[in-house]
Amino acid sequence: MPGAAEALPTVTVTLVAGAVPPASGALTAHCIGGFWREVGVASDQSLVLTAPKRVEGLFLTLSGSNLTVKVAYNSSGSCEIEKIVGSEIDSTGKFAFPGHREIHVLDTDYEGYAILRVSLMWRGRNFRVLKYFTRSLEDKDRLGFWKFRELTADTGLYLAARPGRCAELLKEELI
């Protein structure tokens, strides 16, 4: 359907990372906070993979049960920044954001990678996207990548991120 990709609301505005480490039982700012670079996206909805704005990186800050997400986008070669605040909901590692969006952390080691499920309702349809993030600007975390591939084996549509200037600027806190 022509123009559909432009009409799809940006799913990736609310990406977050962090789950409860098995030993601690509580989400803490030092575990979740900081820089994350988007490395992979998997969805069975092609519109999600062709969005005009592409997330390159996130900077997360946890304060109580609120999570502030600073998102760096690449929009036709220009960097855009957006901040959004979500709240932890019924289970640790699951957050709700404005616009009927939820993020659930499926797997993370906090130091290298995080795998998230983003869910949202748009035009009466449920969309689900799996996202793979690393702390590094390079693709160093192969264990996280293989876990992402295992979780998304039945999805069918993948998009691997390219290194981007916006993620670099966000990591250096220049934007």
UniProtKB/Swiss-Prot annotation:
Task: Give the GO cellular component terms, alphabetically.
Answer: extracellular region
Please, which domain of life does this record's source organism belong to? Answer: Eukaryota
Disulphides: C79-C166
Q: Name one Pfam family in it.
A: Lipocalin
| GO BP annotation list | response to hormone
**Localization per record:** Secreted
Q: Which Gene3D superfamilies match?
A: 2.40.128.20
Q: Give me the glycosylation sites of this protein.
A: N66, N74
**Transmembrane region positions?**
none
Please give the Gene Ontology molecular function terms for this protein. small molecule binding
The protein in question is named: Epididymal-specific lipocalin-8
Keywords of the record: Disulfide bond, Glycoprotein, Secreted, Signal, Transport
